[in-house]
């Protein structure tokens, strides 16, 4: 059920990006367009997909309401465990699913007998998701995002490399998405410069916390695209973008 809803969200992302990007072909990147970040979309194309989401949500609510307390907790535990492990897999990182399940169960107050104790990193990743899904009514602030980022990188490093943790990325080196061998690199995307991030994130957070009359699925899709476009952190942007999406869903 969750996979189907996320598939629809990604379809919405494609529709929004296509509509936005084709408005001004003179801009190299989406954030350089003159009307950034005023997103537009095609209601006719989205209405069917959003209707499918509501149908799936209705079925899910119906099934959950028919479950007893223990089965409902078990279903929530299974869903969160899968969501957390799959999000990390997207980044090429394989988490120990038993440790993830153990940490999620502990945060939910569910018996963890027979499960291994989660290590510091796994517990940090779980804390990130639990804060988003359990405290979804709280405002999203720069401090909250910094806490999420710190939970992802408790050692202050990404692999072997020291990174800026719990703060926006810094330095003059551009944040680029590149492919190709050394000397034949192709730049596919370049994010806003680091000195532009505080301004860009203020725009983003003001919009996120504004009580707009907008479908939560659509808001989740826009927020995901907007956040990864800014790419405000040295690392972990994809995982935090998906966590923001979960916050709205």
Regions found by a protein language model. Give the residues of each.
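FIC/Doc superfamily catalytic core
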Residues: 1-249
């Amino acid at each position: 059920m969750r996979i189907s809803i996320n598939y629809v969200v990604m379809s919405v992302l494609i529709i929004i990006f296509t509509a936005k990007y084709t408005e001004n072909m003179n801009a190299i990147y989406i954030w350089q367009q003159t009307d950034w970040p005023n997103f537009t979309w095609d209601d006719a194309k989205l209405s069917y997909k959003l209707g499918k989401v509501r149908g799936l949500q209705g079925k899910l609510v119906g099934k959950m309401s028919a479950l007893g307390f223990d089965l409902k907790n078990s279903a929530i535990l299974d869903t969160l465990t899968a969501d957390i492990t799959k999000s990390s897999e997207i980044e090429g990182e394989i988490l120990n699913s038993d440790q993830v399940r153990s940490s999620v169960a502990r945060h939910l107050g569910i018996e963890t007998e027979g499960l291994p104790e989660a290590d510091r990193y796994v517990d940090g990743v779980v804390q990130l998701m639990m804060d988003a899904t359990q405290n979804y009514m709280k405002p999203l602030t720069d401090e909250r995002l910094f806490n999420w980022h710190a939970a992802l990188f408790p050692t202050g490093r990404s692999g072997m490399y020291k990174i800026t943790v719990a703060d926006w990325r810094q330095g003059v080196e551009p944040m680029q998405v590149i492919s190709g061998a050394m000397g034949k690199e192709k730049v596919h995307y370049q994010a806003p410069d680091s000195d532009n991030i505080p301004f860009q994130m203020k725009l983003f957070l003001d919009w996120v916390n504004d009580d707009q009359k907008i479908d939560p699925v659509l808001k989740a899709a826009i927020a995901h695209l907007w956040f990864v476009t800014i790419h405000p952190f040295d690392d972990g942007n994809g995982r935090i973008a998906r966590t923001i999406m979960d916050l709205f869903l």
